[in-house]
Every structure is written in C-alpha cells, then in structure tokens.
C-alpha cells in the first residue's frame, strides 16, 4: 500500500522562529557578470556625476565640516603634556 501522508507543518513554526525569520538581504548593486563589455563600460561612464546630493534642513546645502574635527595623536599628546605641566606648576606655588 502506498504512503498517503507526504507533508506536515507540525513543529515547523517553532523551528522557523528559533533563529528568527529574517528579511531577505537586498543588495545595493546588482551583479554585472555576463553583461556585454561595451554596455558595461557605457554604464560606468553614464553613472559619473549622478551621485545623489545630501538633503539638509529643507533645501540643498553643502555639507558643513564638523565643529570639532578629529585631531592628530601628536596634538592630543602635546595638549595633555601641557595640561599636566600647568597642574604641576600650580601645585608648586
């Protein structure tokens, strides 16, 4: 006699949720594998200058530099040494 039951969803839901049901990964750039070389080259040239400008506070503005840009390590060390020397000088008085 042939087997009648071929599929069951028993315990499947628990197993599926054990590691969480995740969204499918959306890749930013599709593969250009197998694309004609001339077409791919033209696409690369066409893409130049089409970068999306950043939208800041209601209109298109230039992105401003940070108020406190990151300092080089030498500058930080020199400032710390100067601060320590000032503390020692104040303690001697």
UniProtKB/Swiss-Prot annotation:
Keywords: Ribonucleoprotein, Ribosomal protein. Residues 1-33 are annotated as: Disordered. One of its GO terms (biological process) is cytoplasmic translation. One of its GO terms (molecular function) is structural constituent of ribosome. Residues 1-31 have a biased composition (Basic residues). It holds the Pfam family Ribosomal_L29e. GO terms for cellular component: cytosolic large ribosomal subunit. InterPro entries: Ribosomal_eL29. Belongs to the eukaryotic ribosomal protein eL29 family. PANTHER family: 60S RIBOSOMAL PROTEIN L29. This is Large ribosomal subunit protein eL29. The gene is rpl29.
